[in-house]
Amino acid sequence: MEWDSTSVKETDVALYTKPQRKQSIRERYTSKFSNVEQNLLKTDDDDDDDNNNININNNNATITTTSTTTTTTTTSTTKTFTISTDNYDEDVNDDQDEGDSGYNNNNNNNNNNNNNNNNNNNNNNSNNNNNNNNKIKNKLNQLETSSDLDFNNQNNNNEDEDDEFLSKDDNIEEIQRNQKGN
């Protein structure tokens, strides 16, 4: 039977010829995976392929990168030294320890007594300061009241006023002496 070429379309012939079929498969492959291949080339910058595991499955590409980190641990060791006391006399050491402890107790008692004395001195000083301050306040109050009376009193003559000012100066000097004593 002779083949009638008019009953077959040109497109059908093109699909079923071997070179055309191989070309179409190659085109489909490159269109699907060209983007994946480009992304793999961009991300895979390392020359060492041992650290990277690339899997392509169902049009999905996964890149697994394994990195090795090294941790440093620092350990500290403590050495304990034991000093031998075989060459010392135990009795002498015991007496010396007892003497030292008694001496320390005496020092502590003396220090406590000194502290108590210092506290007493501080209390006395504060009391003295308070007494002196009260005296000064009283003197100042007296000066203020006496000066008001003196200036308001018109019957005093000049000599009396001079005497009054001298007595005020004496009081001020006494106050200054008390302040220096503190």
From Swiss-Prot:
Compositionally biased tracts (Basic and acidic residues): 165-182
Region named Disordered: 40-182
Biased segments, Low complexity type: 52-86, 104-134, 148-157
Comp. bias (Acidic residues): 87-100
The protein, known as: Putative uncharacterized protein DDB_G0292330
Originating species: Dictyostelium discoideum
